């Protein structure tokens, strides 16, 4: 036969009566005890389990058993050492054997809860811990009774004190014997010394010697103190001498360094001065060459005059063309004004003509209407009007022709204007080309030389400024070094010599500048003289030329000089702009290079960060693997714990039997001590027995103490290692947290499973209840229909029943209905609370597992 699959806890389902709300009353054969135990079990089941589970979930790592431990200690501190019969007399309601009851309960729970092995193992582990604790308490109580040990468990101290007491007793006896022997010897010596007469003298001499000894000791102490002081002073003086020597050596090194620096700087200044002298000589040579070039330029200025004359002629032609252009523009503007006036007149004439035509048409119509009255007059009038009309049409045609002529004249004028403008543009272009050619021809002779001169002057000024700044900085440094250096006089002499040289150089530079100014003034004077001589020669060559021509030539020359000046200024501005753009380009290039460098640095930093992150990922992976291995090991340990459960039970049984044996022996010893209270021999025998037992216990405890001390040392070493290696502590913490999370996950899934089982059971019961209600209601409806069919008469089609005679039974509410309602409300409240608590616990565990935070409480 195939077994039907059922959900766990299916046996807990209750049998319901056909009642509207609530549980069914249990059968009478189950008894009153079953009703007490199972009456509200299903509704309060989850609520009763809540506190224990809540405590365990709040603090999973540490099991707090303070209340149970104090209770057990109070119960079994002294009573456990007394035989069982006496304990039962004192406490008739107490249990005989705690371990047996615990084992039986454990077996019952394992039989009942086969579907939840995790809970079973946890409960068994808790019970084993409790049993172990009880056994420890019993052992401590026995030790207290036997050896009068304190509550703190100070076993070793008491044993050591007892050993010391025995040793002290033995020593006391020996000392007493030695003291008696010494007393006897002293008595003998005194008896012998009474015979001698020189005892007083010996005593006096002995006292003097003692005083001398004391004085010598005091003197020795004083001399030792003085010696110590002298040694300290010598040490301090030696330290001071050593420090002074080190400072002196350091100062000597610093002075040597400063002297070397000064010598190097003096050498640098001498080299720079020689280089400057060379530069000055080069500049003089350049000035001479420039003067020669200027003279050559003055000789070549004759060819420029022809060019200037051609330029003047072209300029005059351009001016004439510009004047013609202006005239043409004025004519065009006047013609445009006339055209606009004519157009206005034409429009006004057209309007008047239209008005006249309309008026005449109206008159013709009137005349045609009045033909019958005045035909002859009308015909005449008509002829006149038609003649007038023809005349007006001819005038209109003539006006149109005049308008066309005006338009043609305007077009011709515009064409002339455009041609003039084109000629002007062409002449301007030619003029520009000729000017540019002239400038190009003059440029290699003038601009290059002038620019070279300017650049050389600028360089000279810059070098002079740099020399001044260097001289100032050198003088400041030299002053500072002279103030600090020990060899002051020699350095001052050197500085004065250098200053004199610098002054001489400055004077030479000033002389050179004056010479340059004189040369420039001479060049300008020579140019003026040259011009005057050229003018005189021209006058001599052609004296017939009028003064006006000469004045115009001078004007042209002045204009050429102005143009050259403008050209030079344009070139200067161009050069400045080029320099500015070059600076901007250099700044942009530098910024670009800096940005590229920053980008490279950032990329390097990012690559370093990436490498670090990769290393961290590898470390985390290794840690994850280690945690997985630890998890597997923990799971193996858990399986081992489950397997060793039976072994623990057997060990508990053995410990229990041993405890019973110890209590029996204790009872026997107590009986023997009561029987042998009177006889001294029996007391000695008992004392010997106790002493032998004491010795055996002492040896055992000492062995245990040694083992515990070794363990303590090992633990201390491991603790020190853990402090040295913080990674190990982190691993331990991770292990503990992993255990905590494992426990939380187990609790979470166990709770969820229990809730789902309860829900399924509730749904089953509801389904059964509703099916029963439907069946019963259908049966009642069928019966009611049959009754109605039988009761309603056939002859009365409208069922005319006298309703006023019917009695309606107003029954009172029974106590049973009220009680059932109250019971249902209470049960609803308890179920809602249990449901809410379960939901809260599930949410708490879920958050704790997801966030991995043990600090969260609910």
From Swiss-Prot:
The keyword Hydrolase does not apply. It is found in: Nucleus; Cytoplasm, Cytoskeleton, Microtubule organizing center, Spindle pole body. Residues 118-725 form a coiled coil. It comes from the Eukaryota. GO terms for cellular component: cytoplasm; nucleus; spindle pole body. Keywords: Coiled coil, Cytoplasm, Cytoskeleton, Nucleus. The keyword Metal-binding does not apply. Its main location: nucleus. Homodimer. Component of the spindle pole body (SPB) required for the proper execution of spindle pole body (SPB) duplication. Potential role in cross-linking filaments or anchoring other molecules. It is essential for growth. PANTHER family: GOLGIN, GOLGIN SUBFAMILY A MEMBER 4. Belongs to the SPC110 family. This is Spindle pole body component 110.
């Amino acid at each position: 036969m195939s077994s039907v699959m059922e959900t766990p806890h299916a046996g807990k389902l209750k049998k319901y009566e056909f009642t509207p709300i609530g549980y069914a009353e249990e059968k009478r054969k189950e008894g009153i005890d079953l009703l007490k135990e199972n009456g509200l079990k299903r509704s309060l089941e989850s609520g009763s389990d809540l506190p224990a589970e809540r405590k365990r979930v709040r603090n999973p790592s540490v099991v707090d058993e303070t209340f149970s431990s104090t209770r057990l200690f109070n119960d079994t501190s002294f009573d456990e050492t007394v035989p069982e019969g006496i304990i039962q007399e004192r406490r008739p309601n107490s249990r005989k054997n705690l371990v047996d009851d615990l084992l039986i309960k454990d077996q019952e729970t394992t039989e009942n809860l086969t579907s939840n092995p995790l809970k079973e193992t946890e409960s068994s582990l808790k019970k084993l811990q409790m049993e172990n604790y009880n056994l420890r308490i019993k052992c401590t109580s026995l030790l207290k009774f036997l050896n009068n040990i304190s509550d703190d468990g100070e076993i070793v101290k008491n044993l050591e004190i007892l050993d010391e007491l025995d040793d002290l007793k033995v020593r006391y006896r020996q000392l007493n014997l030695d003291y008696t022997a010494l007393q006897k010897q002293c008595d003998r010596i005194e008896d012998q010394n009474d015979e001698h007469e020189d005892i007083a003298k010996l005593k006096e001499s002995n006292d003097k010697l003692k005083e001398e000894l004391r004085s010598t000791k005091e003197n020795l102490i004083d001399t030792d103190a003085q010696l110590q002081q002298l040694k300290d002073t010598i040490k301090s003086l030696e330290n001071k001498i050593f420090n002074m020597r080190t400072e002196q050596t350091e100062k000597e090194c610093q002075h040597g360094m400063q002297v070397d620096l000064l010598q190097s700087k003096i050498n640098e200044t001498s080299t720079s001065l020689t280089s400057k002298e060379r530069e000055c000589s080069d500049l003089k040579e350049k000035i001479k060459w420039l003067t020669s070039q200027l003279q050559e330029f003055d000789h070549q200025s004759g060819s420029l005059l022809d060019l200037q004359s051609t330029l003047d002629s072209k300029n005059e032609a351009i001016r004439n063309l510009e004047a013609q252009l202006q005239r043409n523009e004025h004519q065009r503007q006047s013609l445009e004004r006339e055209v606009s006036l004519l157009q206005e007149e034409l429009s006004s004439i057209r309007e008047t003509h239209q008005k006249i035509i309309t008026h005449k048409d109206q008159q013709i119509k009137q005349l045609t209407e009045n033909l019958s009255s005045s035909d002859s007059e009308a015909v005449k009038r008509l002829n006149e009007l038609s003649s007038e009309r023809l005349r007006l049409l001819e005038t209109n045609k003539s006006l149109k022709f005049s308008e066309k002529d005006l338009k043609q004249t305007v077009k011709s004028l515009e064409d002339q204007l455009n041609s003039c403008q084109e000629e002007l543009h062409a002449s301007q272009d030619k003029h520009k080309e000729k000017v540019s050619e002239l400038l190009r021809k003059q440029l290699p002779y003038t601009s290059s030389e002038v620019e070279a001169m300017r650049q050389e002057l600028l360089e000279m000024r810059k070098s002079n400024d740099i020399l001044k700044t260097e001289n100032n900085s050198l003088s400041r440094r030299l002053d500072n070094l002279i103030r600090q250096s020990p060899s002051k006089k020699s350095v001052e002499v050197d500085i004065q010599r250098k200053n004199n040289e610098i002054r001489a150089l400055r004077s030479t530079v000033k002389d050179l500048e004056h010479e340059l100014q004189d040369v420039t003034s001479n060049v300008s004077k020579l140019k003026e003289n040259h011009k005057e001589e050229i003018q005189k020669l021209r006058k001599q060559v052609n004296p017939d030329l009028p003064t006006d021509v000469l004045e115009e030539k001078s004007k042209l020359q002045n204009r050429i000089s102005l143009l050259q000046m403008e050209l030079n200024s344009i070139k200067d501005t161009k050069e400045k702009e080029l320099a500015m753009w070059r600076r901007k380009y250099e700044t942009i290039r530098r910024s670009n290079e800096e940005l590229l460098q920053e980008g490279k640095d950032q990329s390097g930093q990012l690559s370093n960060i990436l490498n670090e992150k990769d290393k961290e990922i590898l470390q985390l992976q290794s840690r994850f693997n280690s945690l997985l291995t630890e998890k597997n090991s923990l799971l193996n340990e858990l399986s081992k714990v489950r397997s060793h459960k039976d072994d623990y039970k057997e060990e508990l049984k053995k410990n229990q039997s041993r405890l019973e044996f110890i209590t029996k022996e204790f009872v026997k010893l107590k009986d023997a001590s009561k029987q042998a209270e009177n006889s001294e021999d029996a007391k000695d025998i008992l004392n010997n027995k106790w002493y032998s037992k004491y010795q055996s216990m002492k040896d055992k405890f000492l062995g245990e103490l040694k083992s515990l001390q070794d363990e303590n040392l090992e633990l201390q070493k491991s603790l020190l290692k853990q402090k040295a290696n913080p990674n190990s502590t982190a691993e331990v913490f991770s292990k503990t947290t992993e255990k905590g999370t494992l426990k939380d996950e187990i609790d979470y899934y166990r709770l969820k499973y229990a809730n789902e089982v309860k829900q399924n059971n509730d749904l089953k019961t509801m389904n059964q209840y509703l099916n029963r209600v439907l069946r019963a209601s259908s049966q009642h409806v069928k019966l009611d229909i049959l009754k109605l069919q039988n009761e309603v008469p056939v002859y009365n089609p409208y069922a005319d029943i006298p309703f006023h005679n019917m009695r309606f039974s107003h029954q009172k509410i029974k106590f049973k209905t009220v009680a059932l309602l109250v019971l249902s409300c209470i049960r609803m409240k308890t179920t809602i609370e249990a449901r809410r608590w379960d939901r809260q616990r599930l949410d708490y565990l879920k958050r704790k597992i997801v966030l991995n935070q043990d600090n969260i409480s609910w």
